[in-house]
Amino acid sequence: MRQLKGRNRCNRAVRHLKIQGKMWLKNLKSGLEQIRESQVRGTRKNFLHDGSFHEAVAPVLAVAQCFCLMPVCGISAPTYRGLSFNRRSWRFWYSSLYLCSTSVDLAFSIRRVAHSVLDVRSVEPIVFHVSILIASWQFLNLAQLWPGLMRHWAAVERRLPGYTCCLQRARPARRLKLVAFVLLVVSLMEHLLSIISVVYYDFCPRRSDPVESYLLGASAQLFEVFPYSNWLAWLGKIQNVLLTFGWSYMDIFLMMLGMGLSEMLARLNRSLEQQVRQPMPEAYWTWSRTLYRSIVELIREVDDAVSGIMLISFGSNLYFICLQLLKSINTMPSSAHAVYFYFSLLFLLSRSTAVLLFVSAINDQAREPLRLLRLVPLKGYHPEVFRFAAELASDQVALTGLKFFNVTRKLFLAMAGTVATYELVLIQFHEDKKTWDCSPFNLD
C-alpha cells in the first residue's frame, strides 16, 4: 500500500515537472522571439518613427492632394500640431475648382442622358459623377475637421500600451502604406487597360487620329455641345482621371481609417491577453476600461466625420457591381475588351470586399476583450471587471453608413444577397445590346 502511494506521488511529481517544463520552454521561446524581433539595425529612420497614425497616413493624404482631395495644410509635419485648414491656401482653391469642374461635367452628362433612352445602363455616368461630387464635398468638410480629429487621435494614442520594439512600432505604418500603394497601382493598371482596350479596338473611329478619336469619345458629353478642340479634349481627360482616382480613393481612405482604429483596439487586446490569466489589481481594470471607453469615443467621433463617405462608398460599389455583372452577360467585341472588363470586375469586387473587411475589423477587435474577460481567474474578479464586461456586452462599436447600417462582417452576406436579388430582377428585363459602343466613356 505504501509502495502504491509512493508511486502515485512520484507520478504526480513527474506530471507536474512536465507541465512546468512545457511552460518554461514556451516562455523561453516567446522571450527569444521578442529578442529576435528587437534585433533590428538601428537606422535613423527607425528611431525617428513614432508609430503615430498621423505619420503613417501622411503619404496617402499627400497623394490625395495631388488629385484635389483633402486640402489640409501641414500633413508632412512631424506631429499633428502642424496640421491646419486654411481657406486662403492653394489646396483649398484647387479643391474648390475641382468641385466646380465636376459640377459642370455632371450637367453635361445629365444633358446627354436626357437625350438618350433611360435605363439602368444609361444613368451610369450620372451615378458616377454624383457619387464623386458628393464624396469630394464630404472630403472638403472632413479637411476642416481633420486637425481636431488628429489631436483627439494622438491623445488616445499616448495612453495606449507601448510597443516592445521599433520593428513592431513601424509595422502598422508599413502595412498601411503597402495596402495603399498596391490599390493605387492596381487602379492605375485598370485605367490603362481601359485606354488600351478602346485604342486597340476602335471599331468605328470618329477621327483619323486614334488619340483624338479616343479623347473625343472620353469627353463625348462635352463635344455634343462644343466643337472638338485638343485643349478641351485634354481638359476633359484630366477631369476623367481625377474622377476615376476619387472613386478609388474613397475606398482606400476608409481602409486606412479601419486599419488605424482596429490597431488601437488590438494594442489594448494584446495588453489584456498578457495579463488576463493572472490576478490583477482593480486599478489595472479601471485603466483598461477607461482606455477602451476613450477609444470608443474616438471611433464615434470618426464615424460622425466619415459616415457620409462610408454610405457613398458602399452604395456606389453596390450599384457598379450589379451593373458590371449585368454587362458580363453581353458578348465582348474583342479579347482586349474582355481582359479589361474582367480585370475591372475582379478589382471592383476585391476592393469592395477589402473595404468591408478592414472596416469591420474595428467591430471584431472591439468584441475581443469580452472573450478575454472570460479567462480572468476567480481571485482576480473585481467590480471593475463586471462593469467592463457589461459595457462590452451592451456596446455596438463600428463605423456606420450615415447611421443606416453598421459595418460588420454580417454586412457582407447582406450585400451579397442584395446583389443576387437585383441581378435576378435585372436579368429578366435584359437584352443583349451593343453596350460597347464607339464611346469609351462607358469604359472608364
Swiss-Prot record:
GO BP: detection of chemical stimulus involved in sensory perception of sweet taste; detection of chemical stimulus involved in sensory perception of taste; monoatomic ion transmembrane transport; proboscis extension reflex; response to trehalose; sensory perception of sweet taste; sensory perception of taste; signal transduction
Record membrane topology: Multi-pass membrane protein
Free-text tissue specificity from the UniProt record: Expressed in labellar chemosensory neurons.
Localization: Cell membrane
Main location as per UniProt: membrane
Transmembrane segments: 57-77, 179-199, 215-235, 241-261, 306-326, 339-359, 411-431
Keywords: Cell membrane, Membrane, Receptor, Transducer, Transmembrane, Transmembrane helix
Phenotype of the disrupted gene, per the record: Flies exhibit trehalose-specific physiological and behavioral defects (reduced response by chemosensory neurons of the labellar taste hairs).
Outcome of substituting V185I: In strain: KY02-C336
Cytoplasmic side: 1-56, 200-214, 262-305, 360-410
Spans within the Extracellular topological domain: 78-178, 236-240, 327-338, 432-444
GO molecular function: ligand-gated monoatomic ion channel activity; sweet taste receptor activity; taste receptor activity
The keyword Transmembrane helix appears for this protein: yes
Record's GO cellular component terms: membrane; plasma membrane
Outcome when changing T164A: In strain: KY02-C302, KY02-C316, KY02-C346, KY02-C350, KY02-C351, KY02-C374, KY02-C379, KY02-C380, KY02-C384, KY02-C390, KY02-C396, KY02-C407, KY02-C425, KY02-C428, KY02-C439, KY02-C443, KY02-C456, KY02-C463, KY02-C478, KY02-C493, KY02-C497, KY02-C500, KY02-C504, KY02-C517 and Singapore
Function: Gustatory receptor required for response to the sugar trehalose in taste neurons. Gr5a neurons selectively respond to sugars, in contrast to Gr66a cells which respond to bitter compounds. Flies are attracted to sugars and avoid bitter substances, suggesting that Gr5a neuron activity is sufficient to mediate acceptance behavior. Sugar signal transduction occurs through coupling with G-proteins such as Galpha49B and G-salpha60A.
Family: Belongs to the insect chemoreceptor superfamily. Gustatory receptor (GR) family. Gr5a subfamily.
PANTHER family recorded: GUSTATORY RECEPTOR, GUSTATORY RECEPTOR 5A FOR TREHALOSE-RELATED
UniProt-recorded name of the protein: Gustatory receptor 5a for trehalose
Protein species of origin: Drosophila melanogaster
